[in-house]
């Protein structure tokens, strides 16, 4: 049994990256590292007896930290479910490619994307574009994220990360809590959604994820 890792960097990866990875596993003869393109590497890693999903997740973070320090290269990593045999390798590659795409699109603040932990991002990625557009119009009408400044969206994202805790969010943003409340009230005035309420917060978060997804799809189609 094995795991397939897919590593991607925003800059071209040279031989240094491969050498650093090989040095990270000096006694593992059955590790295979293959360039996919100038920006991606695939690595086939044999699963040891007793290896857990947490071990694999930690390994991905170890690779990220090591490459950052020793190869001066920042990477994001997706990995597959456990591969029982090599016949399942094509399916595993599809898993990692999907995990990397969904991860970068919906969880860009993260660096590791397990295929089996994509959450709601995988569901949204499979929705038809027309259904997404209908949902956005139902929620926002003619209002889009462009009507909200980047600072407000960043504050909202931090607010969600802190489980709708106003005091903690304000502290982390070095912002007076009344300023944060004012921004949340402005969003409510524009959208009708009170982000201090869990249901409205979830609706807004999903809507923003869908907006980002549609924008990404349109950017790809214009390339």
What is each residue range found by the language model?
Residues 1-223:
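Cytosolic nucleotide-utilizing catalytic cores of signal-transduction proteins
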